């Protein structure tokens, strides 16, 4: 595990067809999603960030296939931050608030996952991203 600006950046050596980062201000949500992705052999988590400023720096220096992005965060919402994500990266919104679903699709998100996450729904979202 490496540290960049106080944020954990995970490096897994397993083979994966896709990498991802997780951006969420809630530590338990980040840990839960990372753990679930490992369990289902999902994309390799290469970064986990509690704030968009660290994530923006990481995205400017690394190629990221998929971004799991929380909507309600301090300083900037996920709906605002999506504009700063490179167009080559796909976005799956993660939130406890269903009222943002329509807006997220209008911003070209691949999918929209409600917390708490469940494996079946997560697998469907990843399948959509892999076949996008």
Feature names for model-found ranges:
Residues 8-10, 45, 81:
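Polar low-complexity intrinsically disordered regions enriched in Ser/Thr and small residues
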Residues 1-19:
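Non-catalytic signal-transmission and effector/linker regions of two-component phosphorelay proteins
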């Amino acid at each position: 595990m490496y540290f960049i600006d106080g944020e954990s950046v995970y490096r897994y050596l397993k083979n994966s067809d896709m990498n991802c980062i997780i951006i969420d201000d809630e530590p338990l949500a980040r840990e839960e999603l990372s753990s679930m992705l490992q369990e289902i052999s999902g994309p390799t988590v290469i970064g986990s960030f509690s704030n968009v400023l660290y994530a923006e720096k990481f995205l400017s220096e690394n190629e990221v296939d998929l971004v799991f992005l929380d909507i309600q965060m301090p300083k900037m919402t996920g709906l605002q931050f999506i504009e700063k994500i490179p167009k080559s990266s796909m976005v799956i919104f993660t939130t406890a608030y269903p009222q943002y679903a329509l807006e997220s699709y209008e911003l070209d998100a691949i999918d929209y996952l409600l917390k708490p996450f469940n494996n079946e729904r997560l697998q469907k979202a990843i399948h959509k991203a892999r076949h996008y």
